[in-house]
Regions:
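Glycine-rich nucleotide phosphate-binding loop and flanking beta-alpha elements
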Residues: 16, 124-126, 179
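Flavin-dependent oxidoreductases
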Residues: 95-172
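Active-site lid/adjacent beta-loop-alpha segment flanking the redox-cofactor pocket in flavoenzymes
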Residues: 149-237
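Flavin (FAD/FMN) cofactor-binding and adjacent substrate-gating region
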Residues: 1-75
């Protein structure tokens, strides 16, 4: 269920200097990207969504899309089942030991052996590997259905620290990690009240200033980030490999990283 409704960069009025700097760079960036896309990637659009307290021009990218991640995971699980691959859920791997041509995988309750081990636990990987990766918790909420919602597409706010999109007639909004970096450097799921409150304020004051809305669900997710934006895809040894540090782009680049990881054998 992929929809290419485009992506929009939004700038609050306090960031008007940043918007103007980005606007000045558009031609340069489009020139760099044109060989890949055969047309300009970024253009200026009017604010047609009724957003408030923002610069009244948006930077639009027609190539960004929306994916139903639940349907994506369901399709991947079906594909795995057809190949008779067994999935063990909710098993906490604590360590691994290499034994010549095999790997012993140690969990909280039992151990088992495998000829190869691929580690793709992203933000949880620093429990097993000595790599430059930091867990980063992301706060998310989603509204109940909103009558006559006129917002369609994906949107980035405040240098990308906030992301929102429509899911049918709901708004999903996440981000705000920059409000509390240290507390959110964790692999423990949980809500941060400060950030969740800010997400609601952004909904009320910027995204949906004319709409009544209620929050339906709140949750958190764990990303894997680092000082570099590139993912780590490499062999740790002859039998152990990793594909980690996806930098908050897991849905977008996860399948590519999976292919690269498979090619490591």
């Amino acid at each position: 269920n992929y929809k290419q409704n485009g992506g929009f960069e939004i700038f609050t009025k306090k960031d008007i200097d940043l918007f103007e700097n980005c606007q000045l760079k558009l031609n340069e960036v489009n020139k760099l990207l044109k060989p890949l896309f055969s047309s300009s990637v970024f253009e200026i659009k009017d604010n047609a969504f009724g957003f408030k307290k923002i610069v009244d021009k948006l930077i639009f990218n027609p190539f960004e899309g929306q994916l139903d991640t639940g349907m994506m995971m369901e399709a991947l699980l079906e594909k795995v089942k057809r190949k008779n691959i067994k999935i063990l859920n909710n098993i906490n791997v604590t360590s691994f030991l290499e034994n010549n041509n095999s790997v012993e995988i140690v969990t909280e309750n039992f151990s088992y052996g495998s000829s190869k081990l691929f580690i793709a636990a992203n933000g949880f990987s620093n429990k097993l590997l000595n790599e430059k990766i930091i867990p980063a918790r992301a706060q998310v909420l989603i509204t109940k259905p909103i009558e006559n919602l006129q917002i369609e597409g994906t949107f980035h706010l405040d240098r990308g620290y906030y992301y929102f999109r429509n899911i049918d007639n709901r708004i999903l909004l996440g981000g705000g990690r920059n409000l509390d970096f240290k507390k959110e450097e964790t692999d423990k799921f949980g809500l941060n009240d400060t950030i969740q409150s800010e997400l609601e304020l952004i909904l009320k004051n910027i995204i949906l200033p004319k709409n009544e809305f209620e929050i339906d669900y709140r949750w958190s997710g764990i990303m894997g980030v680092g000082t570099k934006k590139t993912a780590i895809v490499k062999s740790i040894s002859d039998n152990v490999f990793c594909g980690i540090r996806l930098g908050g782009m897991g849905v977008a680049i996860g399948s590519i990283i999976g292919n690269e990881l498979a090619d490591e054998i």
